[in-house]
Amino acid sequence: MKKILIAVIAALTLTGCSLTEPIPVRGEVVSCADIKTVASSGSVLDCLDGSEGLAVESIVGPALINVWGTWCAPCRQELPHLAHYLGTKNPVQVIGIAVEEKNTASVKKFVETHGMTWPILYDASGSTRSQFGMGVPVTWFVDASGTVVYKKYGPFKSVEEIQLNVIKYLGVK
């Protein structure tokens, strides 16, 4: 009996350590106007808030471009980590690209109810599929010159993972 109790306590402790903290804020649809860009001839994506769209190729960093979908369970799992990372007041901009969505209204509702506070581009036509590939989530690390220096496939498991990758690939602490 004592061994079972110890095993249960250990399991609960380990489970508690792996749980993601709740997202600290209510989400909001954010303007794309503050995204750092340069002139580009790429295909323009709409901004979720209705402000002027932009081409993915025009984004300069340091930046994380996170491709996701409301229907994607791993994407939802990494959202709290991205939200907490933004809460650290870091100098790296985070930009989301919502893909394979039925309409902007459902994406806006998702953003607001899931604590997302970063600009979201909307890929209604699937034009980024050839750039980012078929699977999501995928996050591109873009340096100050606009060069993609690393592609992270799959969800972030912690805010520390994001921070370590930002230091490693973008040189930003």
Predicted regions and their residues:
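N-terminal targeting signals for export/organelle localization
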Residues: 1-46, 161-164, 168, 172-173
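Short pre-active-site segment immediately N-terminal to redox-active cysteine/selenocysteine motifs
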Residues: 61-63, 68-71, 135
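Hydrophobic beta-strand anchors of alpha/beta hydrolase catalytic cores
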Residues: 64-65, 94, 139
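Thiol/disulfide oxidoreductase modules built on the thioredoxin-like
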Residues: 112-116, 123-173
